[in-house]
Amino acid sequence: MAFAPMGPEASFFDALDRHRASLLAMVKRGAGETPAGATRVASSSEVLTAIENIIQDIIKSLARNEVPAFTIDNRSSWENIMFDDSVGLRMIPQCTTRKIRSDSPKSVKKFALILKVLSMIYKLIQSDTYATKRDIYYTDSQLFGNQAAVDSAIDDISCMLKVPRRSLHVLSTSKGLIAGNLRYMEEDGTRVQCTCSATATAVPTNIQGMQHLITDAKFLLIVEKDATFQRLLDDNFCSRMSPCIMVTGKGVPDLNTRLLVKKLWDTFHIPVFTLVDADPYGIEIMCIYKYGSMSMSFEAHNLTIPTIRWLGLLPSDIQRLNIPKDSLIPLTKHDQMKLDSILKRPYITYQPLWKKELEMMADSKMKAEIQALTLLSSDYLSRVYLPNKLRFGGWI
């Protein structure tokens, strides 16, 4: 069944079509390049062998009367991170490591957690079954203590084995939503047709299992906040701008939402834009989609989309549109610290227009939420701001 054309006339998308042509040319130039040290989807036998080797090392340590320990790349230091403009933030090949020792009061529990989770992952892969992070937590909630401890152990194991989480047969529940001109088949054969209606589709739990993706979308819009996403659907923005796809991670995106956006980019190579608040935390979220995060830098190749463009809300838009000053919010001390941190990151050097916008925010000492546009008119965002941005190439 073909998607029903409901959007604007073809000439509306001229700027988008030109942008896509430049993206396709760039993709063609960089085809086949994979960064050294990138995680890859490993076969079940490879992961099982890697786990067996780790356990053998522990047994050998015990046999030599040495203290068993896990050696894990340090994912919490900028010294271990490099910027690659084709991938984003990724770990350097020879990064510093940390030891999780079994005889240290500070790390003995962490050692036990990793050992326990390794055992569970081994059984999952052997039986070709999957479990969610939540399932793993509830198998021994007393040992784990909290969900965050499980999440951290899984990420450490993924980093230690140099494989993405999906190769470990561990899934996470999705909080993200998707709407628009897209249909696909899930791993179990379920056919899903996303729509432009007010009811969005939940991001699948197993992104790797998505098959037969079909779309005629001209662009993909990532919306920072669920409230803005729902407002756009209620205002029929998705229908009026059809064909398009909209995604929200409801704030800081979970892994599945990031994997989905990456899969859509890799499959269709359509322009991807972000709509975030003009504040340091909105910009941080946009940077996670575009360049990745320090903690997940070992898996950047599977998660980042450096071609993402910032559609709004730009600090310069606040001045250009004469948004009332009483709707602006002063930057807090934490905001200013976050802004300073972003300005010092390696990728900002490669984005002079972004840097200019961030400096404008720093100079004004003010921030604005997307909702501030409603002061101009209740549907200004969906009927004026976004359509004009898309039509006239108002992205950076």
From Swiss-Prot:
InterPro entries: Meiosis_Spo11, Meiotic_Spo11, Spo11/TopoVI_A, Spo11/TopoVI_A_N, Spo11/TopoVI_A_sf, TOPRIM_Topo6A/Spo11, WH-like_DNA-bd_sf
Binding residues for Mg(2+): 224, 277
Family per similarity comment: Belongs to the TOP6A family.
Name of the molecule in the record: Meiotic recombination protein SPO11
Residue span, Topo IIA-type catalytic domain: 42-177
GO molecular function: ATP binding; DNA binding; DNA topoisomerase type II (double strand cut, ATP-hydrolyzing) activity; metal ion binding
Enzyme Commission number(s): 5.6.2.2
Any single Pfam family the record assigns to this protein: TOP6A-Spo11_Toprim
Tissue: High levels are found only in the testis where expression is restricted primarily to meiotic germ cells. Not expressed in spermatogonia. Highest levels are found in pachytene spermatocytes. Very low levels are found in thymus, brain and oocytes of embryonic ovary. Not detected in adult ovary. Isoform 1: Expressed early in meiosis, when most double-strand breaks (DSB) are formed.
Catalytically driven reaction(s): ATP-dependent breakage, passage and rejoining of double-stranded DNA
Gene3D superfamilies per UniProt: 3.40.1360.10, Winged helix-like DNA-binding domain superfamily/Winged helix DNA-binding domain
Species of the source: Mus musculus
Main subcellular location of this protein, as a coarse class: nucleus
Gene Ontology, cellular component aspect: chromosome, telomeric region; nucleoplasm
